[in-house]
Amino acid sequence: MNSVFVYCELEGTQIEEVSFELLTKGRKLASELGVKLEAVVAGHGVKGKVESQILPYGVDILHVFDAPGLSPYTTRPHTAVLVGLFEREQPQICLMGATAIGRDLGPRVSSTLTSGLTADCTALEIGDYEDKKNKKSYENLLYQIRPAFGGNIVATIINPDHRPQMATVRSGVMKAEVLDENYAGQVVYEDVDAFVKPEDYVVQVLERHVEKAKNNLKGAPIVVAGGYGVGSKENFDLLRQLAEELHGEVGASRAAVDAGFCDHDLQIGQTGVTVRPKVFIACGISGAIQHVAGMKESGIIISINTDAKAPINELADYVIEGKVEEVVPKLIKFYKAHSK
């Protein structure tokens, strides 16, 4: 029970951004606990290509599994790799991205190891817990924090008796930061056949189609986001015009998506995308916990709302009281007149 593990996802031989974010958080947790940070990567043709990507994030030990059957991802081989590795290494904590792969792999591993898992965490901390009923005290547990009950509360979930403590985190929730470009971590090239049986390769991927992203919400310097208060699909088009004028991207709250004002791929928040733009313009957004979780680290937040007491206004740097359909056209007109 002496390490924090991060499962690193791959696209070809390139580590996914969410894994860098988790390595950064994993390094902080490991340092606080006084244990090693370990990472595991499984793919094909990755030897010699992933080490320089992963070690600079402060990884003490990198476990590399390289075999043709490990790429593209399929459930059983990767499950066998993690289960076998965790049974041998006995980690305290395992972090994964809340991605299509993480949502498939995480439950498989936690179920096999009977360890439990908390999905879509918005924060991870180390803390103690006292079980007054059973008169037990626990130290250095992983606090797995996430919105619950429809986003009305923020729950802190712990796993005191089973290991590893497993959590998934959405891309963008944590911030990726290189610790040391020359960090001297150890690399272990594992024997894949010792972990994966031939029958684990029963599923083969015959063909893959990768869609290009429809937007660049995560990388946009300016985001114009709309909520239920926008009022209609037609009014939502005004936000697109403003975003185009500002060279930004359009986003939305879950309420706006559920109302049919826009597609789900624009959703920002706990069940959508996490963004960190320099400027975030919230139009008709009330400020539910789940939405705020996806945009609270924006540089400047501007709220346009008819409700002066809307929760989003407490977070905003500037508040414009008024109807979206009246305020936004004025902003568009102003920027058209003054843009170079």
Where are each of the predicted segments found?
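N-terminal glycine-rich FAD/FM-binding segment characteristic of electron-transfer flavoproteins
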Residues: 1-340
